[in-house]
């Protein structure tokens, strides 16, 4: 009987140490519920939205390819970027979307080349905070939403070639790097219909670290001699040397 009681106490103690800390009703919410969906079988058709109630913009880790209504699926093992989204459902798809992705090593823009393996064991998802370890780049990404934007924090390894990719997606987009202000501005027109002819979603990214590398990207072509691109599919790459554990805020 004493052994049984000791076992029960040990089990409860272990559970207490690993149980999630609840500070409010929002902590009962798991944004990952309903994300194991695909076109052939809907099991929720949700995505892990990081957002404030009635926020203007939502953010989501993007496992699907550009234009895929199933932007995040639980059984995927690669993240291509962290997307600003306004998507009501995968069937209706998205509008006004663009993505941000930290990478290390080679300066690449292609969504498959920049993608990184990740594990749900190294992923934290709540409505008000998201964190994941990008194994291929050895970078930790954290996101906290605001009413109209979000705060990003990237924790880089020691690397002479650390970058952030900004992908304004296709359908007509514009991106400009402003090194003197540690800033990237631009717009995306990506949509799935039902928007005005002059629709644009403008964005501004401000970094707390100066750029030592800059490049504009037009239709997949990376040009280090240009600071802006205005084309069917525009984007940008900025880079810097980082120390082990150095955090870059956006």
Predicted regions and their residues:
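Bacterial Sec-dependent N-terminal signal peptides
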Residues: 1-21
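Accessory carbohydrate-recognition regions in carbohydrate-active enzymes
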Residues: 20-250
